[in-house]
A protein has these predicted regions:
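Helical "substrate-binding/catalytic lid" subdomain
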Residues: 1-76, 80
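Long, low-complexity C-terminal extensions of enzymes
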Residues: 54-58, 64-116
Length: 116
């Protein structure tokens, strides 16, 4: 069930920025990510967190906040940013444990993910 929620959140986000056929965009990305995860486990982790790219994670959160406020002022899509934060937190932890990022970089990421 969690995978369905995650995929539909990604589809809603893409629809919000004007991509009508979000499934067509996501299908190859999701297929490749799932295949790598099944074959490589946590070794398949890529992206800004595994690179320690704090600025990109911050930009993602700012963009999600802007999109959510512009599209749904009633907060209907607030779950998307909450999911991003939860998954970013978990990914940071896994990357630190697997020595993909240093403890110092992990702390910087945690400060961006959970600024309060």
């Amino acid at each position: 069930n969690h995978l369905v929620t995650l995929v539909t959140q990604a589809m809603r986000t893409l629809n919000t920025i004007g991509i009508e056929d979000a499934a067509a965009v996501l299908r190859p990305l999701l297929s490749a990510a799932l295949e790598r995860a099944l074959n490589e486990g946590e070794g398949a982790l890529t992206g800004p967190i595994s690179r320690g790219d704090v600025g990109t994670v911050s930009s993602h959160l700012n963009a999600l906040d802007s999109l959510e406020q512009a599209k749904e002022p009633d907060g209907r899509d607030r779950d998307i940013q909450a999911s991003y934060r939860a998954l970013a937190r978990a990914t940071t932890q896994r990357c630190e444990i697997n020595s993909q990022i240093t403890p110092e970089v992990a702390q910087q990421l945690y400060q961006v993910i959970d600024p309060d």
